[in-house]
């Protein structure tokens, strides 16, 4: 599955580019939810590729607010690199990377979002 604004969802190229720009500039999840509502109102029910696209942007916004500089999944491993770290720059449970339990892309993105959401910054 490709995370995108598909041509069969928003057929006009200039509109797609405009929405790509709006999503890239959004830095709060509330802004993304507003954009999602606008897309739903204008274009109807979104295809899976667009849902993945919006979920990835939600993860990006949340990760920035939790001071992560990168989020990557390799197989079942979730690798979250912290902005400030005294020792290990990666978030781990014990000495291991968190494990993702689902292989279905949209559920996996939801799992990543929920994991990052549960992370608490240390002062």
Walk through the language-model features, giving the residues of each:
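Accessory helical-bundle/CTD segments and flexible terminal tails appended to RecA-like ATPase motors
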Residues: 1-123
